Curated annotation (Swiss-Prot):
GO terms for molecular function: protein-macromolecule adaptor activity. GO terms for biological process: cell fate commitment; cell fate commitment involved in pattern specification; embryo development ending in birth or egg hatching; embryonic morphogenesis; nematode pharynx development; Notch receptor processing; Notch signaling pathway; oocyte development. The keyword Transmembrane helix applies. Essential subunit of the gamma-secretase complex, an endoprotease complex that catalyzes the intramembrane cleavage of integral proteins such as Notch receptors (lin-12 or glp-1). It may represent a stabilizing cofactor for the presenilin homodimer that promotes the formation of a stable complex. Required for the localization of aph-2. The gene is aph-1. Its main location: membrane. This is Gamma-secretase subunit aph-1. Signal peptide: none annotated. It comes from Caenorhabditis elegans. Component of the gamma-secretase complex, a complex probably composed of the presenilin homodimer (sel-12, hop-1 or spe-4), nicastrin (aph-2), aph-1 and pen-2. Residues 286-308 are annotated as: Disordered. It is found in: Membrane.
Length: 308
């Protein structure tokens, strides 16, 4: 039962990431490389955060909040460093594909001026590796005899990590989904600031919004151990909607188009549009493959007449 629970948690946690990967990344080799490179940059930021935490723990008695802040700043700086690297490598990427011409490398799309798509790809790479590191220790415990909680931590710690009870796997799964999508929005906002810096006075606003929302979401997550799971997820989901709407505006959309898109998605989900579309396509495919009986009868009658 423990292994089945772990597999179900992994599938649910990374299903949105898999959907985005298959829709926007899987068909392009360059985007696949950038996806994994984004994961690498997040791992580098985690390394520097670990070194900072190790150094601070030898000086200060309680370094939780300070180490958490340093970790967030390191992650945002890694996004800036990734943007600068891609900006310098843009000439090399443009040599692979020329705009309006046949690609030198088949299957590689034109990445020129595809800033927001690059941000989505790289942010998804950061989000996936972040969610994996966030969940894999807990999911490894779930794969055991089915005991939910951290027994060793319960013996030495003061916080009741077992307060969520049977809903603890669900909490980790929802947190992983939100964390992945948050990293996509934060990357879009930070890269928009990096692109517009020095061009407009308000270029710092998207980057500041990313840092503030990152801090807020992270500190809200620390309240999960105190039993405020429903409240934390509700606030985080609201913040995610605001971040997605802001990214939609950054990419040239409007709030009304964002609201209409959500309404249409809900309508399609309720009416099972995808299922109905698949059924209709299968019916059409079956009708095209089937051979009608009347022409065969007519041919048979014609042949009998000729023989007579």
């Amino acid at each position: 039962m423990g292994y089945l629970l772990t597999i179900a948690c992994y599938i649910a946690s990374f299903s949105p990431s898999i959907a985005l990967f298959c829709s926007f990344i899987a068909h392009d080799p360059v985007r696949i490389i950038l996806f994994f490179l984004g994961s690498f940059f997040w791992l580098v930021s985690l390394l520097f955060s670990s070194l900072a935490w190790l150094g601070l723990s030898t000086v200060l008695p309680d370094t939780f909040l300070l180490s958490l802040t340093v970790c967030i700043i390191a992650q945002e700086l890694s996004r800036v460093a990734y943007f600068m690297l891609l900006k310098k490598a843009q000439r090399g990427l443009n040599k692979i594909t020329r705009q309006g011409q046949i690609s030198v490398a088949p299957g590689v799309s034109d990445l020129h001026n595809a800033r927001h798509m690059l941000a989505l790809v790289c942010g998804l790479g950061m989000g996936v590796i972040s969610a994996l590191f966030y969940t894999m220790n807990a999911f490894a415990i779930f794969s055991g005899p089915g005991t939910i909680g951290l027994p060793n931590a319960l013996k030495t710690g003061e916080i009741d990590t077992n307060r969520a009870g049977k809903y603890l796997p669900l909490c980790y799964t929802l947190s992983a989904i939100l964390l992945t999508l948050f990293h996509v929005t934060w990357t879009i906002m930070v890269w928009d600031s990096c692109h517009k810096i020095g061009r407009i006075p308000s270029a710092f606003v998207p980057g500041a919004a990313a840092v503030v929302s990152h801090l807020l979401v992270t500190f809200l997550s620390s309240l999960n151990s105190r039993g405020f799971h429903v409240l934390v997820f509700a606030v985080q989901f609201l913040i995610l909607l605001i971040c997605i709407a802001y990214c939609n505006v950054i990419m040239g959309g409007t709030i009304s188009s964002f609201v209409n898109g959500i309404g249409q998605s809900i309508t399609d989900a309720v009416t099972l549009k995808q299922v109905r579309t698949l059924i209709e396509e299968r019916k059409l495919r079956t009708q095209r493959q089937s051979v009608p009986d009347e022409p065969m009868t007519e041919r048979a009658g014609t042949s009998n007449t000729v023989n007579a």
